[in-house]
Amino acid sequence: MIKIGAHMPISGGFKRVPKETHEIGGNAFQIFPHNPRQWKAKLPKDDDVEIFKKRVKEYNLTEDSMLCHSGYLINIASPKEEIWQKSLELLILEMNICKTLGIRYLNIHPGSHLNSGVEKGINQIVKALNIAMEKEKETFILLENVTKKGGNIGSTLEELKMIIEMVKYPERIGITIDTCHAFDAGYDITNKEKLDKFLKMIDKLFSLEKLKFIHLNDSKNELGSNKDRHENIGKGKIGVKGLKTFLTNETIQKIPWILETPGDNEVHKNDIKEVFNILGVKQ
């Protein structure tokens, strides 16, 4: 069975997420564990958690279909001590929020080295992850591929591999592949042969077992543009034909898909319908 959903709003509490996921035609979801544009965060209230967990069961949402996405301000690759420390503290709190909600996976962007160099940036990431995973021992961290702009680390699979090889607990780290980011970084996932090569590379570097989620987005920009601007399904440069190549791949169909396309729940509902239209599947 295909698992698909979208990034869902949490204003009004976590408790609303399972029901709204069902209403848009989803059986998977992603959420922020707090306001992503603030350093402030706190553990959710007991009643919110209780209703959330009850509805997770009610709507048959499984552990492998629920994902938290780290806040925008976190940069554990930063060479600036104050930012790195604040990022580490917030990351640990996010992991504890995940644990409280019963969500196993936390997706993070590796971060930007801010012109300090990839090697130093990776060392900072590894140091932070080692401390965080010592402090909170249940959450599974997913490193997301990104585009190269702004000193970002993780635009290549090899950079993600370096991080995983260096951490103390590699068994608690996996990856998320974002289709827009991959396409914009120069990986042609619209071509069957090149997609197969891309997946073989993932298997060789990490094993496909490490690939836990797909961020399913079209791209506003051309292959290799390094822009990172998401577009709605079938309306971008990946397009219907390219997405069909990607989505009909047997390996890809075994991994949950999370939409991060522009728009609200109603737009995401239509994007999910478009995904099934591309697949030729009736809902």
UniProtKB/Swiss-Prot annotation:
<dbReference type="GO" id="GO:0003677">
    <property type="term" value="F:DNA binding"/>
</dbReference>
<keyword id="KW-0227">DNA damage</keyword>
<dbReference type="InterPro" id="IPR001719">
    <property type="entry name" value="AP_endonuc_2"/>
</dbReference>
<dbReference type="GO" id="GO:0003906">
    <property type="term" value="F:DNA-(apurinic or apyrimidinic site) endonuclease activity"/>
</dbReference>
<feature type="binding site">
    <location>
        <position position="181"/>
    </location>
    <ligand>
        <name>Zn(2+) 3</name>
    </ligand>
</feature>
<keyword id="KW-0378">Hydrolase</keyword>
<dbReference type="GO" id="GO:0008833">
    <property type="term" value="F:deoxyribonuclease IV (phage-T4-induced) activity"/>
</dbReference>
<keyword id="KW-0234">DNA repair</keyword>
<keyword id="KW-0479">Metal-binding</keyword>
<comment type="function">
    <text>Endonuclease IV plays a role in DNA repair. It cleaves phosphodiester bonds at apurinic or apyrimidinic (AP) sites, generating a 3'-hydroxyl group and a 5'-terminal sugar phosphate.</text>
</comment>
<dbReference type="InterPro" id="IPR018246">
    <property type="entry name" value="AP_endonuc_F2_Zn_BS"/>
</dbReference>
<dbReference type="GO" id="GO:0008270">
    <property type="term" value="F:zinc ion binding"/>
</dbReference>
<keyword id="KW-0540">Nuclease</keyword>
<keyword id="KW-0255">Endonuclease</keyword>
<feature type="binding site">
    <location>
        <position position="260"/>
    </location>
    <ligand>
        <name>Zn(2+) 2</name>
    </ligand>
</feature>
<keyword id="KW-0862">Zinc</keyword>
<feature type="binding site">
    <location>
        <position position="109"/>
    </location>
    <ligand>
        <name>Zn(2+) 1</name>
    </ligand>
</feature>
<dbReference type="Pfam" id="PF01261">
    <property type="entry name" value="AP_endonuc_2"/>
</dbReference>
<protein>
    <recommendedName>
        <fullName>Probable endonuclease 4</fullName>
        <ecNumber>3.1.21.2</ecNumber>
    </recommendedName>
</protein>
<feature type="binding site">
    <location>
        <position position="178"/>
    </location>
    <ligand>
        <name>Zn(2+) 2</name>
    </ligand>
</feature>
<dbReference type="GO" id="GO:0006284">
    <property type="term" value="P:base-excision repair"/>
</dbReference>
<feature type="binding site">
    <location>
        <position position="215"/>
    </location>
    <ligand>
        <name>Zn(2+) 2</name>
    </ligand>
</feature>
<feature type="binding site">
    <location>
        <position position="144"/>
    </location>
    <ligand>
        <name>Zn(2+) 2</name>
    </ligand>
</feature>
<dbReference type="InterPro" id="IPR013022">
    <property type="entry name" value="Xyl_isomerase-like_TIM-brl"/>
</dbReference>
<feature type="binding site">
    <location>
        <position position="69"/>
    </location>
    <ligand>
        <name>Zn(2+) 1</name>
    </ligand>
</feature>
<comment type="similarity">
    <text>Belongs to the AP endonuclease 2 family.</text>
</comment>
<dbReference type="GO" id="GO:0008081">
    <property type="term" value="F:phosphoric diester hydrolase activity"/>
</dbReference>
<feature type="binding site">
    <location>
        <position position="228"/>
    </location>
    <ligand>
        <name>Zn(2+) 3</name>
    </ligand>
</feature>
<feature type="binding site">
    <location>
        <position position="230"/>
    </location>
    <ligand>
        <name>Zn(2+) 3</name>
    </ligand>
</feature>
<feature type="binding site">
    <location>
        <position position="144"/>
    </location>
    <ligand>
        <name>Zn(2+) 1</name>
    </ligand>
</feature>
<dbReference type="InterPro" id="IPR036237">
    <property type="entry name" value="Xyl_isomerase-like_sf"/>
</dbReference>
